[in-house]
Amino acid sequence: MPLTNTPETLNILNPDFRMPEHCGGDRWSILHGDSLQILRQFEPNSFDAIITDPPYASGGSSQTTKSRSTNEKYSSMSKEKALPDFDSDQMDQLSWMFWTAAWLQDARRIAKPGAPVCLFIDWRQLPAMTLALQWAGWTWRGVAVWDKVASRPQKGRFRQQSEYIVWGSNGKMPLERNVGCLPGVFRYPNPQNRIHVTEKPLQLMRDVVQICEPGGRILDPFAGAGTTVLAAVQEGYEAVGIEMSDAYFQRSAERLKTALESEVNQN
């Protein structure tokens, strides 16, 4: 099926909402805008899972180090090769917790009963994320690990080679869901040729989205490079992403078009 600019997934938005800039195709869409504004425009019970890699507002133990650009905090690329920075990553911890709880509360309203939520985070913000999740009314169910396999060695210290997936559900989560047993540790190196500063490996996300029941609709409120949306579509789901950055909206839309058009042509 050819890609279009008016995917059916956008029918779950409030009909009175002025449609933001968007791009999409068969079973996917990316909306350009602020998640705090757009999340409130979806109809209740619209999504079977919320899976996202939000801004961590981390990268240091002091406000001075946290206030650096995302490239300075999370990338070792030279200035000539640096990727675009992204917003909402310079908050102090209390502000970040309130902001995170706010969008998670909006996300819970539009998630179906029992829908899983998966949130990537680093070790510094791990405790705060578990609190924000519960403040927003979700049931916290555990933490999975992304083992990045390698990281910069530090003499006399443990390697910081892991990030975490805080996960939970919108209330009770029936054991009879049509989902298999998923691992608690995912081992994948950082992707090469990234288009986003904190891009996650595609195969990692293809594994993680399988927490959703087959054929469900997945929301990523912080789409970034579009990896979650791409992984979801490749695994047979519908997916909606939201991205505030002009640069990353364009990059993710182009990536999805290219990847999914290629798959359509091959089939």
Model segments located where?
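S-adenosyl-L-methionine-dependent nucleic acid methyltransferase catalytic domains
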Residues: M1-A150, G156, Q160, K172-P174, ...
